[in-house]
Curated annotation (Swiss-Prot):
HAMAP family linked: IspF
Organism: Corynebacterium glutamicum (strain ATCC 13032 / DSM 20300 / JCM 1318 / BCRC 11384 / CCUG 27702 / LMG 3730 / NBRC 12168 / NCIMB 10025 / NRRL B-2784 / 534)
Cofactor: a divalent metal cation
Gene: ispF
Catalysed reaction, written as an equation: 4-CDP-2-C-methyl-D-erythritol 2-phosphate = 2-C-methyl-D-erythritol 2,4-cyclic diphosphate + CMP
EC number(s) on file: 4.6.1.12
Cofactor comment text: Binds 1 divalent metal cation per subunit.
Site (Transition state stabilizer): H40, T136
Name this protein carries in UniProt: 2-C-methyl-D-erythritol 2,4-cyclodiphosphate synthase
């Protein structure tokens, strides 16, 4: 009798303050004419939340332990690069990515017109389905006041 494949689920949140003049990277896409988010990296809250959820699901730590803020080689690193590296890390530990889902929380950018493009880009990077959505908080809180953006993500992985 073989052991059943048991999926592992991870969840994560990421948030960054908006920084005037910084390029806006969301879900591995550049949004022209919109201020981006501050951070040690590119400030892509969606990519970062997905990376963190994948690490959570696999039990391999979290975003802070994965890249840290004191490592100069990650200064300005893109969400795309982080997703590639976490996929390689999971694979090296025998994990397969089942799927990921993430939601962007913020007033800007208008995400709907590029949602499918972002899903395709992230799916290609991680080698698994990706579902994305976006919402506002009806002008409540730091995201509602356009002081920052946040993202919540879930990921499903299993041992190969």
């Amino acid at each position: 009798m073989t052991n059943p494949i048991i999926p592992r689920v991870g969840i994560a949140t990421d948030a960054h303050q908006i920084e005037a003049g910084k390029p806006c990277w969301i879900a591995c896409l550049l949004f022209e004419g919109v201020d981006g988010c501050e951070g040690h990296s590119d400030g892509d809250v969606v990519a970062h939340a997905i990376v963190d959820a994948l690490l959570s699901a696999s039990g391999l730590g979290d975003l802070g332990s994965f890249v840290g803020v004191g490592r100069p080689e990650y200064d300005g690193v893109s969400g795309t690069q982080l997703l590639k590296e976490v996929r390689e890390l999971l694979s090296a530990h025998g994990y397969v990515i089942g799927n990921v889902a993430a939601q962007l929380v913020g007033q800007t950018p208008k995400f709907g017109p590029r949602r499918e493009e972002a899903q395709q880009v992230i799916s290609e990077i991680i080698g698994a389905p990706c579902s994305l959505s976006a919402t506002t908080t009806d002008h409540m809180g730091f995201t509602g006041r356009s002081e920052g953006r946040a993202s919540v993500a879930t990921a499903v992985v299993w041992k190969a």
